[in-house]
Amino acid sequence: ARCSMLNSPEYNLDQSDTYKAIDEFQLFMNHYPESGLVDSCNTLISSLRSKLETKSFEKAKLYYKMEKYRSAVILFNTTLEEFPDTDFKEEVLYLIIRSNFLFASNSIQTKKEERFDNTIKSYYTFVDQFDSSKFLKSAESYFKSSKKELDKLRNVN
């Protein structure tokens, strides 16, 4: 397990050895639950999971930077599902709002209403958890713009 951990590369590279190390540490703890090394194994697993968490977040941000907003939202949500207590949660939720808004803005007319609704829903999810965030002003701006766009769309229809 320790060898696999030492082979585990930086977060931006293939993480096969990271997964292998986590599995091996877990296997050790399952076979030797009374071992004095269990606490050490848990600490090392936590460190390895942190690397996977960073990789997941950075991959989603890459899609965001490439303006693949729909894919970015999917990957940001995957990050939250796989790492619910992530240190990046505030930024992830904010980037979901931003990605949803930009995706809606660049959508065809018939899809805009649904997609601006998604922006508003993601805003509410964000403020429920981070009502005093450093991203709050910007998030509110996307929320207000989405409301305006929805009003325009609903008045046309």
Predicted regions and their residues:
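Acidic, polar-rich low-complexity tracts and alpha-helical solenoid repeat scaffolds
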Residues: 1-157
